[in-house]
Design a protein with these regions (language model features):
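Extracellular TM2-ECL1-early TM3 structural module of rhodopsin-like
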Residues: 32-44, 67-134, 138-152
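Intracellular effector-coupling site of seven-transmembrane GPCRs
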Residues: 192-220, 228-231, 248-295
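Intracellular signaling interfaces of 7-transmembrane GPCRs
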Residues: 63-73, 136-158, 240-280, 303-315, ...
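Hydrophobic residues within alpha-helical transmembrane segments
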Residues: 41, 45-48, 77-80, 91, ...
Length: 440
């Protein structure tokens, strides 16, 4: 085998038919520049932003006692798995984008370790998102019952189980991934020149490729379908259902307060907080689907598509999907700090104090407070007594509250009957729900 001067040129073997055969199976040794340059740019950006954002999340949560909450405990675990996924996966992706695809330059152990760690950290991220969603679902929809199931000690056990389950689930991938070599074709077996193209008389020299074992197609399908169902389909169904339930509870919260007999006047700040929570919940579902669906679709196509019978157009679609899925796969980890933390005023304040420093933070909040006060003063109208508004308006301004009878302003007397106890319990529950939304 002759090594070409340009590393991206085809490998030249002693037999021309072998040269053509290898190229027909493995294709070009380097990614085309039209794909390599955008890949390097996007992967570099994701690596810098993702690692910085997730490390900031970890530092902010650790250094600020006000951030030591159950939700942030899950967020720190998620940030840890995302940092590991970015650090362990993206450098190798960058190397593959600017170097030859084959022969693989590293040992088989490194090949296995790379596949295992990438799969392991991605599983941990998905399961942590599920745990975080369960915690939010319980806290908002079942606030009284959530006190039984949510505690720091139990959260620690849950997070430990998440990492152990992810570790065990990723082990089969480590055993299935090997250094593959293109097997010798029938016309090259037991030929006088076979030793010139093969080291072992069975495979072609210089065709080492890190990937799942070519000869274990059934095992490939089992692992890929398992990952798709357990770590994408089921979490997607659960997350969507949980957040739809949360959205329904938040939208019905005002009417439930009104039916309970208690008058609640929602301020503009509380209304903005609720809208922010709704945006976060919708963004979580959309991000999960958008970032993970192309990756799993590409893997499913890779085990079901017969390249020998596929059209050139289908092949181009698959190649484009390969690059798109890689970008989406890692962008989920890079965007998690934004999706889970940027809408939280408490996190922004802690981030500014921890990362930017006290002086910059003081200037920022001083200007922000002045702008908010000016806006409030401009929007302030004549004061209308609350009782008069209750008599003359169907709703309380833009708060979309249900009509409130003037008699409800006198308070609600609860008797000892079972019916009144249930009403009182319901009122307490919705008070807790409303407080949860305000604290986000």
């Amino acid at each position: 085998m002759d090594i070409p001067d340009d590393p991206c040129d085809r490998l030249i073997y002693a037999n021309h038919n072998i040269t053509v055969y290898v190229y027909s199976i493995l294709g070009e040794r380097c990614a085309p520049k039209s794909a390599a340059i955008p890949s390097v740019a996007m992967y570099s950006l994701l690596l810098l932003l993702g690692v910085f954002g997730n490390l900031c999340t970890i530092v902010v949560i650790i250094k600020n006692k006000s951030m030591h909450t159950l939700t942030n405990f899950y967020l720190m675990s998620l940030a840890t798995s995302d940092v590991l996924m970015l650090l362990l996966g993206l450098p190798m992706e960058l190397y593959d984008a600017i170097n030859v695809v084959y022969p693989y330059p590293f040992s088989e152990n490194i090949c296995k370790l790379r596949a295992f760690l990438t799969e392991f950290t991605s599983y941990a991220s998905v399961l942590t998102i599920c745990c975080f969603s369960i915690e939010r679902w319980l806290a908002i929809c079942f606030p009284l019952k959530s006190k039984i199931f949510t505690s720091f000690s139990r959260a620690g056990v849950i997070i430990f189980c998440v990492w152990m389950i992810s570790f065990c689930a990723a082990l089969p991938m480590a055993f299935l991934v090997v250094l593959n070599r293109v097997p010798l074709p029938d016309f090259a077996i037991d030929q006088p020149w076979s030793y010139l193209v093969s080291d072992d008389g069975m495979t072609i020299r210089g065709t080492d490729l890190c990937g799942m074992d070519f000869f274990k197609q059934m095992e490939q399908k089992i692992i890929i379908y398992f990952a798709f169902i357990v770590f994408f389909l089921l979490p997607a169904v659960f997350i969507t259902s949980a957040y739809c339930h949360i959205l329904m509870r938040l939208k019905n919260m005002d009417s439930c307060f009104g039916k309970s007999g208690r008058l609640v006047q929602v301020t503009d700040k509380q209304e903005r907080t609720r809208r922010s929570v709704l945006k976060v919940l919708v963004a979580v579902v959309i991000s999960f689907f958008v970032c993970w669906f192309p990756f799993h679709l590409q893997r499913l196509l890779s085990i079901n598509m017969n390249e020998s019978n596929s059209s050139p157009a289908m092949h181009n679609v698959f190649i484009s999907l390969f690059y798109l899925s890689g970008f989406c796969y890692y962008s989920n980890s890079a965007s998690n700090p934004i999706l889970y933390n940027i809408f939280s005023g408490r996190y922004r304040s802690a981030f500014c104090h921890t990362i930017l420093g006290e002086k910059i933070t003081a200037k920022y909040y001083a200007s922000a407070s002045y702008g908010e006060r000016a806006a409030n003063q401009r929007g302030a109208g004549p004061k209308v007594p609350l009782i008069q508004r209750a008599k003359t308006e169907r709703n309380f301004g833009s708060n979309n509250l249900p009509p409130v009878k003037s008699s409800s302003l006198q308070g609600v007397a609860y008797s000892a009957s079972k019916k009144d106890k249930r009403r009182k319990s319901s009122l307490i529950e919705f008070n807790v729900q409303f407080q949860v939304v305000q604290d986000e």
